[in-house]
Design a protein with these regions (language model features):
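Glycine-centered secondary-structure boundary/capping sites
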Residues: 1, 97-99, 142, 173, ...
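Sec-exported extracytoplasmic/periplasmic mature domains
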Residues: 2, 30-33, 70, 139, ...
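Hydrophobic faces of well-ordered beta-strands that scaffold small-molecule active sites
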Residues: 2-8, 37-41, 77-80, 103-107, ...
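A structural signal for the main folded, soluble domain(s) of proteins
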Residues: 8-10, 88-95, 146-148, 203
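Active-site cleft segment of glycoside hydrolase catalytic domains centered on the general acid/base Glu
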Residues: 12-133, 160-186
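Substrate-binding cleft of secreted/luminal carbohydrate-active enzymes
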Residues: 36-38, 147, 151-155, 168-204
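Polar/charged alpha-helical tracts
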Residues: 60-63, 70-74, 139, 155, ...
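Glycoside hydrolase catalytic-domain groove-lining segments
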Residues: 113-164, 196-204
Length: 204
């Protein structure tokens, strides 16, 4: 068997009705507890189409976690849930005055728009440096344990429009051989960094 990580998605309604969000999260946890104790709270929280218009919206959702952990001892909660490399959003989710406690920092760390994992963003950050920065933030945070999970990454395939997230733009889509090479590089870099506990190739 394999450990399952269940991602609990938010919507704009979650932010508008915190009580309903809390009830929904509890229901999801209760439903899946026979199968797993691991849950990711929120998804792509720095993209408004997923319901959070800013990090404050997400932090309000996280403030429901203490009650959840009290009711279900032993559950493992991962959060931050920032997609792509946006360190200011990650910083805000990990350093704040809100009251919650995460067992792992999760990041949906796509680098496909750069091409290879060795390519740099902002002239400085290749994948290795991105991982080290996020891991360092998690290690210094009082809201999160020093564990880094990459809970989504991928290189969308050429000629799969309209099913690819970026509608098949050739700048950030690749053929299967290149995808396999880039994913191998990604996993190798993550392993060699010594700061990543797990990497998930996309989500179901």
């Amino acid at each position: 068997g394999r450990n399952l990580l269940v991602t609990i998605l938010q919507s704009r309604q979650s932010v508008a009705d915190i009580s309903a969000w809390s009830d929904a999260v509890s229901h999801i946890v209760e439903t899946f507890l026979p199968l797993t104790q691991e849950f990711q709270i929120g998804n792509a929280i720095n993209r408004s189409k997923w319901g959070c218009h800013n990090t404050t919206d997400y932090l309000r959702l996280l403030e429901t976690l203490p009650d959840l952990k009290a009711r279900y001892p032993g559950i493992v909660l991962a959060g931050s849930s920032v997609i792509d490399f946006e360190p200011l959003a990650t910083l805000r989710t990990l350093f704040n005055g809100h009251q919650f406690d995460l067992d792992a920092c999760c990041a949906l760390l796509y680098v496909n728009r750069r091409g290879s994992p060795f390519s740099k963003q902002y002239g400085l950050f290749d994948l290795r440096r991105k991982l080290r920065l996020i891991a360092t933030l998690a290690s210094l945070s009082k809201r999160c344990a020093s564990r880094l999970w990459i809970t989504e990454t991928n290189w969308p395939l050429l000629d799969t429009k309209p099913y690819t997230p970026n509608s098949g733009h050739p700048r950030s889509t690749v053929d299967e051989k290149t995808q396999a090479a880039y994913l191998s590089d990604y996993y190798r870099i993550a392993w060699q960094s010594g700061c990543v506990e797990r990497v998930y190739w996309w989500q179901l």
